[in-house]
Design a protein with these regions (language model features):
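RNA pseudouridine synthases
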Residues: 1-172
Length: 172
């Protein structure tokens, strides 16, 4: 999943960090994860976690507007700030179990399932392998999607209805 924004002349953004926090409403936690994963870009150039150190006789640092590309790099009208949510996440604590999931909607951000009654949403000590999360984990594995199970809303075990699963931390 890739998100981008082109700076307009009337925008009040100061730097890359400001665009991510103010326009995209990226949390500090997610910002740190994106920064460490090197998945933030200014004009398609990766943003480095901190100011790069130039070695003697080296020109390996990346510059835009004559400044190293970092979260504090200034943005100008026409600049494109983007980030990608294309990284794997560990959900190995959920055991994948094949289930007949009633998927009513799916796109690159969300999965919506019609949950039947008498099915727990999350594993517990009483329901460790017979939950909706176990079925979703199996489904994600079958489509080669390595993401955490992010339940947006929760229904009690005895309640049927639609359950929304976010496919990444940003849309959750």
């Amino acid at each position: 999943m890739h998100y981008s924004y082109i700076i307009k002349s009337n925008d009040k953004f100061i730097n890359v960090r400001d665009v991510l926090k103010s326009h995209f409403l990226v949390s500090t936690r997610l910002l740190n994860k994106l920064k460490k994963s090197k998945l933030i870009y200014l004009n398609n150039v990766p943003v480095t976690p901190s100011k790069p150190v130039l070695l003697q006789n080296s020109s390996s640092a990346i510059f835009i507007h004559n400044i190293p590309v970092t979260l504090d790099s200034p943005v100008l009208p026409g600049d494109k700030v983007s980030f990608s949510m294309d990284f794997d996440e560990d959900s190995s604590n959920i055991i994948p179990i094949k289930m007949n999931l009633n998927i009513v909607y799916e796109d690159e951000s969300f999965l919506i399932i019609n949950k039947p009654a008498n099915l727990a949403v999350h594993p517990t000590s009483y329901h460790f392998t017979d939950t909706l999360s176990n079925g979703v984990k199996y489904y994600f594995d079958s489509i080669n999607l390595h993401k955490k199970i992010r339940i947006v809303n929760r229904l009690d075990r005895n309640t049927s209805g639609l359950v929304i699963i976010a496919k990444n931390e940003y849309v959750q």
